[in-house]
Curated annotation (Swiss-Prot):
The keyword Manganese appears for this protein: no
Cited function: Has antibacterial activity.
Upper lineage: Eukaryota, Metazoa, Chordata, Craniata, Vertebrata
Organism, scientific name: Macaca fascicularis
Coiled coil regions in record: none
The protein's name in its UniProt record: Beta-defensin 107A
Bridged cysteine pairs (disulfide): C37-C51, C41-C60
């Protein structure tokens, strides 16, 4: 019975690690698009997609002046 709880805890930890990897991957994509992760974009920035699931959901990019 103790081994069951150990395996269950290990699976929860693995799930957390894989979520962190995808967040890092999304942040790298955002950086390649010359943006940055913020919860709210400034008035002169544009939302270009998701960055992380919970903490900072938006990737912002500065607008180009015409």
């Amino acid at each position: 019975m103790k081994i069951f709880f150990f395996i269950f805890a290990a699976l929860i930890l693995l799930a957390q690690i894989f979520q962190a990897r995808t967040a890092i991957h999304r942040a790298l994509i955002c950086k390649r698009m010359e943006g940055h992760c913020e919860a709210e974009c400034l008035t002169f920035e544009v939302k270009i997609g998701g960055c992380r699931a919970e903490l900072t959901p938006y990737c912002c990019k500065k607008r180009k002046k015409d």
